[in-house]
Amino acid sequence: MTDAPDGPAPDVLAGPVPDALPRRRGRAWALAAVGVVAAPPVGGGAVLLTRPAAPAATALELAGDLRTHDPALVVGDEGEPWYVFSTGDVRVGLGAPQIRRSTDGGRTWEEVGTVWEAGTRPRWVYDAVPGVENFWAPEVVEHDGTWYLYYAASTFGSNRSVIGLMTNTTLDPDDPAYAWVDRGEVISSTPGEDNWNAIDAGVVDVDGTPWMAFGSFWGGIQLVELAWPDGTLADPDAEPVTIASRIGSPNAIEAPYLAERDGWYYLFVSRDSCCQGSDSTYNMAVGRSRDVTGPYVDREGRDLAAGGGEPLLATRGDVVGPGGQSYSKGYLAFHWYDAAEGGDFRLGIRELAWDDEGWPVATTREEQAQDAG
């Protein structure tokens, strides 16, 4: 894998300063990138002092079956398995969401099945979305001992889409009680009637009330209130609220994911073009709010509903088009395209760092050094 664990930041900077920078400014700028600052001269000489390096994410070095799109990560408790649910493959399990498991803390992954097979598939979905072949972008959340799996049914280029729901009492496929139960439709969108697209669910629980973000292109990212224990809409007649948009056509924003940390609600989104292999331009951005309903703003105070967004992770080297993200217990999961392997898709997982202002950092120390020049 190209994402490797980070080593410590160097104590001093070696190598030439880029010619494009003024020599004095260039040295100070480059030293600051690795946590080194120059003190005023004392007794005729400069003294180099170290300061804590900027926060950096840790990329897990992954192995095993990593061919996933739109991973929904579930980080297990200590000693327990981790799971990733991802977009289905039409050739496997009738295109149902795929399931992978790790028993070594999220580093080695094996495929352990699909959410349904021929005898258990939700047949109503095929009537709701004619032509659907595989099922996209699952989301998995737990409430009161029940696991809720949200999935999307759609076809490329259309907003005739539906988000469906299945539940289970366990994620362990080896448990005798393991069985996914169809709970029907959560929300749908219809061409010519709805200016949003019912795919890409992301759910967060706020003091016992679940909220679901969803959306792709069209009118951008929407938010609706759900209700436990059903896990469906609290008010089927309520209109979704727009919480993120690129404003202009084609409004290339999707894959919302909501997470709470230290009194802030964070909205992670993917922007631009997915699923083009090495030509993908996917990238991730984030905003935050004190209220789950928004407004979500970036570091500069720009509203995500008005085109704002704090950059989080983008193409670097052979890691192309990272996006389709989820978040679980401090870890960010996403897919990316490996330019060194012909643009094949891969799973990525990073333990996020957080800066002094409470913003997530997804870049590694190595990437930050490369960005610094």
What are these regions (language model features)?
Residues M1-W29:
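Terminal targeting segments of Actinobacterial cell-envelope proteins
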Residues P8-P10, A33-V37, D262-G263:
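N-terminal trafficking/processing presequences and adjacent post-cleavage segments
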Residues P16, P22, A54-G373:
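Carbohydrate-active catalytic/glycan-binding domains of CAZyme proteins
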Residues L21-R25, A38, L49:
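Intrinsically disordered, low-complexity sequence elements enriched in Ser/Thr/Gly/Pro
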Residues R27-A38, G43:
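Sec-dependent N-terminal signal peptides
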Residues A39-A59:
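C-terminal region of N-terminal signal peptides and the immediate post-cleavage residues
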